Each structure stands twice: as structure tokens, then as C-alpha cells.
Curated annotation (Swiss-Prot):
UniProt biased composition (Polar residues): 42-57, 560-575
Keyword Cytoplasm annotated: yes
Name recorded for this polypeptide: Protein TALPID3
Family: Belongs to the TALPID3 family.
Highest classification ranks of the organism: Eukaryota, Metazoa, Chordata, Craniata, Vertebrata
Length: 1533
């Protein structure tokens, strides 16, 4: 513990009472006044009573010697007091002020919380003003009367005065009783208030009486306490007197033995009376203090605290002046023979040492002293006693004589010892009774007793023989052991009481004062800790500085030339540092004074020696750092360094061990204003250091060039600057310099940073820097990326080459290390010391300073490197630019640790660089793969238009679940760009698709198509499961490209012909057979396909399975609807067959359908936001299309039929989360359908007004179509819904009427037009379908769904075809909701935007059925069909070529008879026009085309291939599917 701290612990009142003490105790030398306990806190009485026996004995023992030199001791004591007291007073005052600055409310915690809550409520909520109207009975009556009279008067219009008077009289008459009542109430209230006032008065009186009683009781208690205290004081005085008598007796006995022993030597006691007088004097002054002692716990605690501090202070003071006694004497000096005197002196010296030791022990822990003052006093006394006894025993043997004391004397000693023990025991018992106030006094008095017998024994032993001494030793040991036991017991009791009292006091303070006291204590403790730590550091730093000064002075003499050079550099550095780096003035000045002077005078060789020595000494390192900071200023990048940890250069360049110590130091430096803008440092250096560089160049030649060759050579002058060059090199300031002047500025920065060094760097760099370049390049490259990005981009350009230099530098730095050992390298040491000293220096604290100081040197070296690096800039410029800072750091790094260490960081950096390169390469590879895949697909499928829509489909499939917006962007022509150009609408989707699906896609496109075609049913089932998961997006992408050729075929006239041709009737039959056999599987496929078609347009892949899946998608409803559609869609299947190769055609019809679906996806995107829950089921369906993509290969013919059927089914599947097999789909679909059907009732109405409800209903549908719609028109979708509603609003009236009144007629007309519409589907869908979809679907949803669903149910139930329409009705119901939402979302805009590339394809296939149903029902069949024709034509025009695969879906009511009655040709042509209910359902179906946007309103003129086959097959498949799905259809329905 520093002495200063302990001195400051002295009580505040020392100075005040110093004079008083001198007056009161004229005989006591002032030095003892420190031992005098002064009042603490209240100051009501002196606490001297609490001081220990050591204080009394010290008064006795020091009495004579102090009297000899009273003036000296007095003056010394006064000085000590001045030193001790003033700082304490100042500190306490400051503490008080600080404590006062903090105002702490005296609330309980609960109250505080309540207040906080109230304040928060007030602050958060504006005051709510409540107007409370008091309704008095009188006023109320008057008001009522007045109102009634006014009402009467106003109608009558009588204004005459008589009427007014009558009214007033009536009012008075009516109010009179009320007034009376009020007066009565007032009288009663007054009486009550009087009673209350009386009660309050009585209460106050009672309170006063109680207060008086309590005050009297308290006074009595206080008096009793005072009496008790007085009694205790008297008792204590008596005991003390008794103890004094015992002490006198013991002293007499001792003197008797001594005199008997000394008789032979003719020495006689001379000073006994004086010693007794001293004892009396020293002991008695305590008595008045005892009487006056205040029993309050606080005073006792303070008294305990103060004496300890004072004792310690006196011991330190005594150490200072030999005249003052080191510790209070415990025994009066007795004349003894020379031997005895020597032994006494030895004992006194030992006691002094013991006291000093104890004082030091006490100083070790300030907090412990404060908390355990009494304990520390007793411990000191015990330790001193025990040590004195042991030492005295050692001293006895040489002093032993042949004299034997008489037995009586031994007995008397035993008796006295027993008495003293008994007295101590009695005191212990009585102390238990006494208050805590008396305890310290007794303990102190008890401490006195053990001391006397010890001394007496010592005196006795001197004259006794060995045998007598042995016996005496035994007796004394027993007595001492007893004493120790008693004292320990007493101390334990005292500690327990004192601790309890102290803790209670602390708790009381903490509880009563709450945080204020705690905060104050914390502040004081923190201040003590800070001051103590600062003092310790100051002392250490002083010694280190002194040693450094001495070493530097010795080195100064060695080289005068270097001194002059160093002085020049130092002066310049000082100017730079002052401008650049502000510091604490006191520390900065001192450090500069210590560092700059020696540094200037230090020769290079001496500096190296100092560095070696300084590395061992943290203080030297600190000086070097400070000096470096002063000379070089903080590195521009020091802020980054701080983040990097200690030195950025160290951090980048080499092993963490060395760089780590520096980094924290750098951080410390960084905390200050050390780091300044690069401009200031570089500019400042650029202005001045250039001149310095010229000087430096001159000085550098003086230094050996071997050192200069290394990059460190520029730092030669840096070593000359000061031993801190080690620190400079360690900080790796050069790296910072490079980073600061990253490029063109690098040479000036070097000049600036290491003012002398820049010249050396320039001169010596060419060889060394080149070498360094070769070695350092690697680390720089890795490092470059680390820092270059953080720092100036211009630096990046300059330092691109430096990275190469850094590699060479790392090698050269290793070389530099060897020259460093030579004195020549003294100039180089800034760099060399980087390597050597940095290891030690980094660990040292000086590194904090070094980074700043080395910054300049390092910058110089870096500049050299940069210059050299500039030559090899041609190498990795990009990396070097990034690593400009890194280069500088790496350069420093290699020297600081060995080159190998630098390579390690470079390896990490290189790893990062390699990772970045790999990421870029991977991205490039992926892009190239995408390009190649796009080209391969385009080559395989020559129709690029088809590729684009297929790509869009794949994108929509993958992106719809992810983001429908991407689908929108890609759904139009952008998809092909997306794949071909490698510009991803959704790069993640493309990458995922390409990476995961390349092999699968190629296999599927080339080989799997046919295989899948062969086994469509099985694949359909598997596809359902797999696609339900996330499998679809990956595969769908590849299948999508395969169907691409079909969309172009569909847009092409042959595609339309194919739709009409319906050549693949057999394939629909196959599909029908499949339906009959794998109704569930196909339905599952189709359920999957439909959502897939919605999202991905994958249903094209599963054309064969589609007809059954359409029926089975939603086992009940899909089976019916899908079968109906399949009947009609069977003609559509021939379209893909006719369009091109059956496998490709299947996929192609799928792809056109998929394209339509992606548009639907885009459409649905806008709705996805609203119906997320619905969309999620839809998203699972998109995976489903993946298997369907393979399936279409197997089921080529059915795919077209599937597409229309799949539209409703997909809508249904989207409605229901269940994308699994048909059975599982049935339940969820039924639930979803029921919900949607209910919602659909509301949806059309809401959509008509808002268009929001359909969006919610479309949640399930949103999977594909919904996402696509939302993609295209998220914001406009609502507006478009409104537009659609407006356009469709007219159609709604028509649709509603048509549905309700002309379902069959409309369906037939729609069918008739659908044939024509195939060509004009796009036109009507774009121009008019949105109207029909928005308004017509709304009406259809509301009216037809509920008006006609029973009809469709009956039809579907009655006929095998109809049951599927039922399922499909449900499907369409869900789909219709979806379509309505899609239309509402702005099928116009979506149709306009997406129908051109993709949505048209989707609309004709999947949505045509629902769209035609909706259109046919709401609009006059001809008009609506015309609209559809126009829409279809538009769709075809807008690269909706897949329109060929449009399914003409009639209302189910119409479809059932029409399908049964209509010839295959009619079936092909007949649009599947559902009943108004089915139209509602297909309004959901429209959702898909609506996603295409315009197609839903237009009838989907979907030519189902081979309607007859489907009619037959569907009848079978319907029967089977109805069996499977009809029940579920009925349930769901």
C-alpha cells in the first residue's frame, strides 16, 4: 500500500484538534498526538479511550526520547499531519460534493416503482381531462322545468310577459321543495363537517398525548442509558485503576528481580518512579475520555477506524525520522546492566520491526482495515507480542546468569499471572454485559495487561540461571497460552459484537439511505483503488524511468553524431505529435521529458541495447510507445487498429502472441484522441516530413547500408530517435503509414510518419523493399483484403503491389533480424525491432505507446515498400488495393514475429481470399451452367418461345412458393432471359434449379419423359407424394423446359388445330382406363398437378394422369369436376399430341398450361399476401407438378384434358392444403372446399365491393395462380379487382342472371363460342374476361355457387360424369374463389402483362373451363363466348400459343348432358361450362386463367382430345373416381 493512501485515511479532525492536543497533553510529545484518538463524525467526545495498550505503552516508552527532541518531533508531526490531513479533508469534501451532486429520493423500493410507473404512464399517455358535471337537485329541477317550459312555450309561440312570469313562477314553485331539500342537506352536511372537525381535533389531541408519553418514555430510557453509561464508565475506571495497581505490582516485582539480579553488577534501578509516572500519566488520561465516550455505534465504529489509521500513520512517520519511536513502547524503560540494555534495545528494535510489519500488513488491504479496524489492532498487538516473546527468548540465553530467584519470587510471579488472567476473565464476562462502546476500551486495556507480564518475564530471565529460566519459560508459556486463549475469546466476542454492530449500521445506512450511501461508499472505494493503483504505477514508472534515464545517459556518451540526428528527429517528431496527438498534460510531459531526452542522446547501438533491456522492462516499452506516439503521432488507422486489437500492423502481419499485447495497448491509445484523420497526419507529415526525409536521407547514409537495404533501414533514424524505436517497430506503425498514404501518398506518408526514416526508406528500400516484396507479398495479399476494404480505396490501388512487397518484406524482415544485432542496424531497428523487440515489446505495456510512435517509422518502411510495390503493382491489383493496409500491417507483421509467424496470418488471409475467389468462381460456374442448360434446353426444344414459357413455368413453380414476384418478372418473356442470360429473376431459384435439377432435368427431358409416359399412373401417385413436398420446384424447373415446345405449338395455329384435332383420343381413353384403375393415384397426381399447374404449369407433364387426377385432385369434388372436364378435356389431349412429339407435346401442352399457371401464379402472388394460409397449401401443390412433369411423358394424351381438369383440381388443391393422394386430398379439400364455398358466397359480394375476400378465399388457390396474380399485380391487384369488378360488374348482372336462369343455355352458347374462342381466347380474356371474372365471378360466387350448387350436385350425383363435376364443382368452388380473387386482383393487368407470354397458356388450359363456366353462365352465351373468343385470340396473340390445349368447360349442368349427349367432337368443342354453381367453382378455375388474368372471364375453349373416349372412359373413370371421390365429394360438398 502506498504510504500516501494510508496517511489520507487519517480523520478530518486531526488538524482541528492538533493544537488542542498539544494544550491538553503538554507532557506528551506531539508525535504521540497521532496516536490520540480524535472524534470522528459527531465529535462529541474524544475517542482516545478506544486506543489500544500499544498506544499507552508507546506513550510511556517514547516519553523520554521524545522529550529530548520535542521540537523536531513536533515539527515532523505537524508536517505529517499536514500531509495526511489536508488530502483527506480535500478528498472527503470532494466526496461530499459528489455525493451531494447525486440526489436520491428517500422512497421505499415499492414507492419508487409506483412513482416510476406513474411517471411512465403520465409521460406515455397524455393527461385525460374528465369533465365532471355536478348535478344538484335544485339545478336539475330548474333545468328540467325550464326545458319543459321552453318546449311548451316554443311550440305555442307565446312570448307575452304573462307567460314568462307564469313560467318563472312555476319554476320557482317547482324548485321551492328542491331548495328546501338542498338547504336541509346543507345543514346536515355542515353538522357532519362539524363532527368530523371535532373528531380530527380529538385525534390530534390523542396524537399529542401519545407523542408526549412516548417522548417522556424516551427521555426516561435515555436517562437510564446515560446512567448505565455512567455506571459502566465508573466500573471501567475502577477496573483500570485495579489494572494499574496490578501493573505497578508487576513492575515492582520485575524491578525486585532485576535489582536482585543486578546487585552483583552494582547497578541499581534509577528510573522506576519516572517510568511509573509515565505509566500513570499515559494510563490516566484515558479515564476522562472513557467517561465522556458516546455509546453510539457510529462513534464506536469511527473510533475503531481512526485509531488504526493513526497508529499506522505514526509508524510511518517514525520510520521517516529516527528520533521518533517506530512504535509505542509497551514497557517503561528500566535501568539494566549493559547486557540488559542491549537486550532491551534489541527487543525495542524487534518491537519496532514488528509494529512496522503489522502496519504494513494493515496497509495491504485498505477495505479490511476500514471494516475490521479493531481486529487489525488486536492482531498487530498479538503479532508484536508473540514476535517480541520469541525474539526475547532468543536473546535470553546469552544474557543468562548464575543467579537464582527465590521461590517466593517465582510464586509471586505465578500469583500475579493468575490474577491477571482472572482479571481478564472477569473483564471478558463483564464486557459481554457492557455495550459495544465499552468493548473496544476493555479490549485495549486487556491488551495492556499481557504486555506487562511479557516484559517482566523478559527482565527476569536476564538474571536467572538456565534452570530457572527453563522453569520460568514453562510458566510463562502456560500463562501466555492462557492469555492467548482468553484474548482470542475476547477478540472473537468483540469481533462478533463489532461485526454485528457494524453490519447493522451498514444495513441501517443502506436501508434508510438506500442507494445514496452505497453510491458514496462505492465512489470512495473506487477512488481509493484508482488512486492506489495510480500511485503504484507511478512509483513503478518512476523507477523504470530513472533506470531508463541512467541507461540512456550512459548510451548518450557513446555516439554524439547519432545524438544530433536523433535530436533533430525528436524535435520534428515532437512538433508533429503535439499537433496530432493530445494527451494528458502531466503524463505526456513527464513521459516526453523522460523519453525524448534520452532518446535523442541514444546512439543506434546503445538504442539496440536499450531495446533489448527495455523488452524485459515494461516501463521502457511504455516510454518507447509514448515517445513513438509523440514523434510519429497516432497512426491514421489506429481506430481500425483498436478494433483489430493492439497494432493493426501486428494484427495483420503475424502471430497473434506478439501482436496481441500491442493490440490492447493500441486500443488504450485509441481511446484517446490519438487517432486523427488521415488527412491531418498525412498532410502534416507531407508538409514537414519531406524536409525531414532529406535530412533523413543524409543521416541514413551515415548508418550502414546493409541495414538500410532492409525496409527497416529507413527506421535507422527511428532507432536513433530513441530506444523507443523498439516500441516503434513493435507497434508496426509502418503498416499504418502505408495504409494511411495508401498509394500515391505512401512516400509522403512515410516521410511524414517516420520523419527521419522516410529518407532512409527511400534510399534503402530499392534492394530491401524488393526483397521484402518477394517475401511479404503473400501476407499482404491476405491482409490486403482484411484492411483495404475498410480503408481508403485510393490506398487499395497503390498498395496492390505492396502486397507483393509484403511477401518479400516478410522474408526480408527475417533477414533484417540478423542485421539488427549489429550496431549498424541501430538505424534499422525501427523495422528490425519490429521483428525482435516486438515480441517482447508487444507483451509490454509500452506497446500501447509504441504503436503510435512506431506508426511513423512503420509508415516510412511501408512507403518504401509501397514505392517498391508500385513497381510490381501489375500483380493482383484488386487484392493489393484491398490489402493496402494489410500490406503495411503484413510488413510489420513479418518482422515482429518470425517470417513463419507472418505466413500463418497470411495463410488465414489467403484462406479468406481463396474463399472469396471460390465463391465468385462458384457463382460464375453456376451462371455458366445455367447458360449452358438454357442453351441445351433451347437446342433440345427448338421452339425458344416454348422454352421461355416453360422456363417461366419452372421459375413460377420454384419462385411461387418462394416469391411470386419473381414469377411475375419471369412469367412473361423474362423467364427465358432469366435462364439464358443467367440474370436471375430469382437467382436463388435458378441456382437451386440448376444445381439440384441439372442431372434430373437432363434425364427427365431426354430419357424420363417416355418412361414416365409409359408409367403415368404409378408416376402420378408417386408424383403426388413427392410433389406435395418440395420436390416439385427442383424437378419442375427441368420439366418446364421440356414442355416449352408445346406452348409455341399451342400459340401456333397447328396447336389450335391440335386442340380441335383431339387426335390423342386413345390417350384420353388410356387416361380414362388409368382413371378407372388408378383413380386415387391419378387423382392424387392431378390434385398435385392442379396446384402444380396453378403454380408451375407442370400439369403438362402429367397429361395422361390429369383426367383422373382432375377428378381425383379433390377426391370428392375433383373427381366429379375433373371427370367432367376430362370428358371435355379429352379432346384437348389430342392437341399436344397433334402439336408435336407426344412426349414433348405432352410436356408442351403442360408447358403452355404451365405458362398459363405461372401467370396464374403471378396472379396469385398478389393474393398470397392476403391468404397466406391458403397459399401455403397451394405452394405444396407446385412441387406436385414435378412428378406430373414426368407423368405427362407417360400420359401424353391425357395431359391436355388434365390441364383443364387440373385447373379446377389445382384450384381445389390449392384451396386445400392436402396435396397428397386423392384420399388424403378428399378430406382437406372437402374442408377447404366447404370453407371456400362458404367464403365464396361472401367472396363474390365482397370482391364486387372490395375484392379482398376473394383474395382470402383464394388463399388455397393462391398456391399457383394466386401467387402469379399477386406477383404481377400485388398493389394493382386490388385496384384491378376494382377494375375487374367494374368491367365484370356489368357481366355480373349478366352472369348472375345467366347462371340462375340460363345455366344450360349459357353453357351451350359458351361451348359454341368456346370453339371459336380457342382462336380468340386471348382477346376476350384480355379485354373482357377480367370484367366477367371480377363481376361475373363475384356474382357467380355469390349467386351461382349457392343458387346452383345443388343442381350441380344433383347432376353430378345423378350422372357419373356429374359426380366428378361435383368434386370439380367443389374444386371449382374453391377454384372459383381463387379465380375470383385472381380476377379481382386485376386479371386485367395480369392478363395484359402475363397473358402475352405465359398466362395465356395457363388460361386456356386450366382456367378455360372455369372461365367459360363463369362467362357462359353470367353472360349471354353468345356474348360471353364472344368475349372468350376475343380473350382466347388475345391470349394466343400474346404468345399464349398453348391455347390449343384450352379445355372448353361447360357448366356442369350443361356438361353432364352435353358430355353424355354430345358426340366426341362436340365434347371436344363443348366448353366444360359448369352450372352456375360450377361456374362459381370454375370462377375458382378461372383463378388459374385469371392468374393468366384475362383467360378466366373468357371461356376456356379447351379442346379436350377425344371427348368420346373420355366420355366412355370418364363414365368408367367417373364411376371409379366417384366411388373414390364421390363420397368425399358429397362430404366436401
Amino acid at each position: 500500500m502506498p504510504v500516501k493512501r494510508l496517511r489520507e485515511v487519517v480523520s478530518q479532525n486531526h488538524g482541528d484538534h492538533l493544537v488542542l492536543l498539544k494544550d491538553e497533553l503538554p507532557c506528551v510529545p506531539p508525535a504521540l498526538s497521532a496516536n490520540k484518538r480524535l472524534p470522528v463524525g459527531t465529535g462529541t467526545s474524544l475517542n482516545g479511550t478506544s486506543r489500544g495498550s500499544s498506544d499507552l505503552t508507546s506513550a510511556r516508552n517514547c516519553y523520554q526520547p521524545l522529550l529530548e527532541n520535542p521540537m523536531v518531533s513536533e515539527s515532523d508531526f505537524s508536517k505529517d499531519v499536514a500531509v495526511q490531513v489536508l488530502p483527506l479533508d480535500k478528498i472527503e469534501e470532494n466526496n461530499k460534493q459528489k455525493a451531494n451532486d447525486i440526489f436520491i429520493s428517500q422512497y421505499t423500493m415499492g414507492q419508487k416503482d409506483a412513482l416510476r410507473t406513474v411517471l411512465k404512464q403520465k409521460a406515455q399517455s397524455m393527461p385525460v381531462f374528465k369533465e365532471v358535471k355536478v348535478h344538484l337537485l335544485e339545478d336539475a329541477g330548474i333545468e328540467k322545468d325550464a326545458v319543459t317550459q321552453e318546449t311548451r312555450i316554443s311550440p305555442s309561440g307565446i312570448d307575452s310577459a304573462t307567460t314568462v312570469a307564469a313560467a318563472t313562477a312555476a319554476a320557482i314553485a317547482t324548485a321551492a321543495p328542491l331548495i328546501k331539500v338542498q338547504s336541509d342537506l346543507e345543514a346536515k352536511v355542515n353538522s357532519v363537517t362539524e363532527l368530523l372537525s371535532k373528531l380530527q381535533e380529538t385525534d390530534k389531541h390523542l396524537q399529542r398525548v401519545t407523542e408526549q408519553q412516548t417522548s417522556i418514555q424516551r427521555k426516561q430510557e435515555k436517562l437510564h442509558c446515560h446512567d448505565h453509561e455512567k455506571q459502566m464508565n465508573v466500573f471501567m475506571e475502577q477496573h483500570i485503576r485495579h489494572l494499574e495497581k496490578l501493573q505497578q505490582q508487576q513492575i515492582d516485582i520485575q524491578t525486585h528481580f532485576i535489582s536482585a539480579a543486578l546487585k552483583t553488577s552494582s547497578f541499581q534501578p534509577v528510573s522506576m518512579p519516572s517510568s511509573r509516572a509515565v505509566e500513570k500519566y499515559s494510563v490516566k488520561p484515558e479515564h476522562p475520555n472513557l467517561g465522556s465516550c458516546n455509546p453510539s455505534l457510529y462513534n464506536t465504529f469511527a473510533s475503531k477506524q481512526a485509531p488504526l489509521k493513526e497508529v499506522e500513520d505514526t509508524s510511518f512517520d517514525k520510520q521517516k525520522s529516527p528520533l521518533e519511536t517506530p512504535a509505542p513502547r509497551r514497557f517503561a524503560p528500566v535501568p539494566v546492566s549493559r547486557d540488559d540494555e542491549l537486550s532491551k534495545r534489541e527487543n525495542l528494535l524487534e518491537e519496532k520491526e514488528n509494529m512496522e510489519v503489522s502496519c504494513h500488513r494493515g496497509n495491504v488491504r485498505l477495505l479490511e482495515q476500514i471494516l475490521n479496524n479493531n481486529d487489525s489492532l488486536t492482531r498487530k498487538s498479538e503479532s508484536s507480542n508473540t514476535t517480541s516473546l520469541t525474539r526475547s527468548k532468543i536473546g535470553w540465553t546469552p544474557e543468562k546468569t548464575n543467579r537464582f530467584p527465590s521461590c517466593e519470587e517465582l510464586e509471586t510471579t505465578k500469583v500475579t499471572m493468575q490474577k491477571s488472567d482472572d482479571v481478564l476473565h472477569d473483564l471478558g464476562q463483564k464486557e459481554k454485559e457492557t455495550n459495544s462502546m465499552v468493548q473496544p476500551k476493555e479490549s485495549l486495556s486487556m491488551l495492556k495487561l499481557p504486555d506487562l507480564p511479557q516484559n517482566s518475564v523478559k527482565l527476569q530471565t536476564t538474571n536467572t540461571t538456565r534452570s530457572v529460566l527453563k522453569d520460568a519459560e514453562k510458566i510463562l508459556r502456560g500463562v501466555q497460552n492462557n492469555k492467548k486463549v482468553l484474548e482470542e475469546n475476547l477478540e472473537a466476542i468483540i469481533r462478533a459484537k463489532d461485526g454485528a454492530a457494524m453490519y447493522s449500521l451498514i444495513n441501517a445506512l443502506s436501508t434508510n439511505r438506500e442507494m445514496s450511501e452505497k453510491i458514496r461508499i462505492r465512489k470512495t472505494v473506487d477512488e481509493w483503488i484508482k488512486t492506489i493503483s495510480a500511485e503504484i504505477q507511478d512509483e513503478l514508472s518512476r523507477t523504470d524511468y530513472e533506470q531508463k534515464r541512467f541507461d540512456q545517459k550512459n548510451q548518450r556518451t557513446k555516439k554524439g553524431q547519432n545524438m544530433t540526428k536523433d535530436i533533430r528527429t525528436n524535435t520534428q517528431d515532437k512538433t508533429v505529435n503535439k499537433s496530432v496527438i493530445p494527451r494528458k498534460h502531466s503524463q505526456k510531459q513527464i513521459e516526453e521529458h523522460f523519453r525524448n531526452l534520452p532518446m535523442r542522446g541514444m546512439p543506434a547501438s546503445s538504442l539496440q541495447k536499450e531495446r533489448k533491456e527495455g523488452l524485459l522492462k515494461a516501463t521502457t516499452v511504455i516510454q518507447d510507445e509514448d515517445y513513438m506516439l509523440q514523434v510519429y503521432g497516432k497512426p491514421v488507422y489506429q481506430g481500425h487498429r483498436s478494433t483489430l486489437k493492439k497494432g493493426p500492423y501486428l494484427r495483420f502481419n503475424s502471430p497473434s502472441p506478439k501482436s496481441r499485447p500491442q493490440r490492447p495497448k493500441v486500443i488504450e491509445r485509441v481511446k484517446g484522441t490519438k487517432v486523427k484523420s488521415i488527412r491531418t497526419q498525412t498532410d502534416f507529415y507531407a508538409t514537414k516530413p519531406k524536409k525531414m526525409d532529406s535530412k533523413m536521407k543524409h543521416s541514413v547514409p551515415v548508418l550502414p547500408h546493409g541495414d538500410q537495404q532492409y525496409l527497416f533501414s529507413p527506421s535507422r533514424e527511428m532507432p536513433t530517435f530513441s530506444g523507443t524505436l523498439e516500441g516503434h517497430l513493435i507497434p508496426m506503425a509502418i503498416l499504418l503509414g502505408q495504409t494511411q498514404s495508401n498509394s500515391d501518398t505512401m512516400p509522403p506518408a512515410g516521410v511524414i510518419v517516420s520523419k527521419p526514416h522516410p529518407v532512409t526508406v527511400t534510399t534503402s528500400i530499392p534492394p530491401s523493399s524488393r526483397k521484402v516484396e518477394t517475401g511479404v507479398k503473400k501476407p499482404n495479399i491476405a491482409i490486403v483484403e482484411m484492411k483495404s476494404e475498410k480503408k481508403d480505396p485510393p490506398q487499395l490501388t497503390v498498395q496492390v503491389l505492396p502486397s507483393v512487397d509484403i511477401d518479400s518484406i516478410s522474408n526480408s524482415s527475417a533477414d533484417v533480424l540478423s542485421p539488427l544485432s549489429s550496431p549498424k542496424e541501430a538505424s534499422l531497428p525501427p523495422v528490425q525491432t519490429w521483428i525482435k523487440t516486438p515480441e517482447i515489446m508487444k507483451v509490454d505495456e509500452e506497446e500501447v505507446k509504441f504503436p503510435g510512435t512506431n506508426f511513423d517509422e512503420i509508415i516510412d518502411v511501408i512507403q518504401e515498400e509501397e514505392k517498391c510495390d508500385e513497381i510490381p503493382d501489375s500483380e493482383p491489383i484488386l487484392e493489393f488495393n484491398r490489402s493496402v493496409k494489410a500490406d503495411s500491417t503484413k510488413y510489420n507483421g513479418p518482422p515482429f514475429p518470425p517470417v513463419a509467424s507472418t505466413f500463418q496470418p497470411t495463410a488465414d488471409i489467403l484462406d479468406k481470399v481463396i474463399e472469396r475467389k471460390e465463391t465468385l468462381e462458384n457463382s460464375l460456374i453456376q451462371w455458366v451452367e445455367q447458360e449452358i442448360m438454357s442453351r441445351i434446353i433451347s437446342g433440345l426444344f427448338p421452339v425458344q418461345q416454348q422454352i421461355a414459357p416453360s422456363i417461366s413455368v419452372s421459375v413460377s413453380e420454384t419462385s411461387e412458393p418462394l416469391t411470386s414476384d419473381i414469377v411475375e418478372g419471369t412469367s412473361s418473356g423474362a423467364l427465358q432471359l432469366f435462364v439464358d442470360a443467367g440474370v436471375p429473376v430469382n437467382s436463388n431459384v435458378i441456382k437451386h434449379f440448376v444445381n439440384e435439377a441439372l442431372a434430373e432435368t437432363i434425364a427427365v427431358m431426354l430419357g424420363d419423359r417416355e418412361a414416365k409416359k409409359q408409367g403415368p399412373v404409378a408416376t402420378g401417385v408417386s408424383g403426388d407424394a413427392s410433389t406435395n413436398e418440395t420436390y416439385l420446384p427442383a424437378r419442375v424447373c427441368t420439366p418446364l423446359p421440356t414442355p416449352q415446345p408445346t406452348p409455341p405449338c399451342s400459340p401456333s395455329s397447328p396447336a389450335k388445330e391440335c386442340v380441335l384435332v383431339k387426335t390423342p383420343d386413345s390417350s384420353p381413353c388410356d387416361s380414362d382406363h388409368d382413371m378407372a384403375f388408378p383413380v386415387k393415384e391419378i387423382c392424387a397426381e392431378k390434385g398435385d398437378d392442379m396446384p402444380a399447374i396453378m403454380l408451375v404449369n407442370t400439369p403438362t407433364v402429367t397429361p395422361t394422369t390429369t383426367p383422373p387426377p382432375a377428378a381425383a385432385v379433390f377426391t370428392p369434388t375433383l373427381s366429379d369436376i375433373s371427370i367432367d372436364k376430362l370428358k371435355v378435356s379429352s379432346p384437348e389431349l389430342p392437341k399436344p399430341w397433334g402439336d408435336g412429339d407426344l412426349p414433348l407435346e405432352e410436356e408442351n401442352p403442360n408447358s403452355p398450361q404451365e405458362e398459363l399457371h405461372p401467370r396464374a401464379i403471378v396472379m396469385s402472388v398478389a393474393k398470397d399476401e392476403e391468404p397466406e394460409s391458403m397459399d401455403f397449401p397451394a405452394q405444396p401443390p407446385p412441387p406436385e407438378p414435378v412428378p406430373f412433369m414426368p407423368f405427362p411423358a407417360g400420359t401424353k394424351a391425357p395431359s391436355p384434358s388434365q390441364m383443364p381438369g387440373s385447373d379446377s383440381s389445382t384450384l381445389e388443391s390449392t384451396l386445400s392444403v392436402t396435396v397428397t393422394e386423392t384420399e388424403t386430398l378428399d378430406k382437406p379439400i372437402s374442408e377447404g372446399e366447404i370453407l371456400f364455398s362458404c367464403g365464396q358466397k361472401l367472396a363474390p359480394k365482397i370482391l364486387e365491393d372490395i375484392g379482398l375476400y376473394l383474395t382470402n378465399l383464394n388463399d388455397s388457390l393462391s398456391s399457383t395462380l394466386h401467387d402469379a396474380v399477386e406477383m404481377e399485380d400485388d398493389p394493382p391487384s386490388e385496384g384491378q379487382v376494382i377494375r375487374m369488378s367494374h368491367k365484370k360488374f356489368h357481366a355480373d348482372a349478366i352472369l348472375s342472371f345467366a347462371k340462375q336462369n340460363q345455366e344450360s343455355a349459357v353453357s351451350q352458347q359458351a361451348v359454341y363460342h368456346s370453339e371459336d374462342l380457342e382462336n380468340s381466347v386471348g382477346e376476350l380474356s384480355e379485354g373482357q374476361r377480367p370484367q366477367l371474372t371480377a363481376a361475373a365471378e363475384n356474382i357467380l360466387m355469390g349467386h351461382s355457387l349457392y343458387m346452383q350448387p345443388p343442381v350441380t350436385n344433383t347432376q353430378s350425383l345423378d350422372q357419373q360424369c356429374d359426380p366428378k363435376p361435383l368434386s370439380r364443382q367443389f374444386d371449382t368452388v374453391s377454384g372459383s374463389i381463387y379465380e375470383d380473387s385472381c380476377a379481382s386482383h386485376g386479371p386485367m393487368s395480369l392478363g395484359e402483362l402475363e397473358l402475352e407470354p405465359n398466362s395465356k397458356l395457363v388460361l386456356p388450359t386450366t382456367l378455360l373451363t372455369a372461365q367459360e363456366n363463369d362467362v357462359n353462365l353470367p353472360v349471354a352465351a353468345e356474348d360471353f363466348s364472344q368475349y372468350q373468343l376475343k380473350q382466347n385470340q388475345d391470349v394466343k396473340q400474346v404468345e399464349h400459343k398453348p391455347s390449343q390445349s384450352y379445355l372448353r368447360v361447360r357448366n356442369k349442368s350443361d356438361i353432364a348432358p352435353s358430355q353424355q349427349q354430345v358426340s366426341p367432337g362436340d365434347m371436344d368443342r363443348t366448353q366444360i361450362e359448369l352450372n352456375p354453381y360450377l361456374t362459381c367453382v370454375f370462377s375458382g378455375g378461372k383463378a388459374v386463367p385469371l392468374s393468366a388474368s384475362q383467360m378466366p372471364p373468357a371461356k376456356m375453349s379447351v379442346m379436350l382430345p377425344s371427348v368420346n373416349l373420355e366420355d366412355c372412359s370418364q363414365s368408367l373413370s367417373l364411376s371409379t373416381m366417384q366411388e373414390d371421390m364421390e363420397s368425399s365429394g358429397a362430404d366436401t360438398f
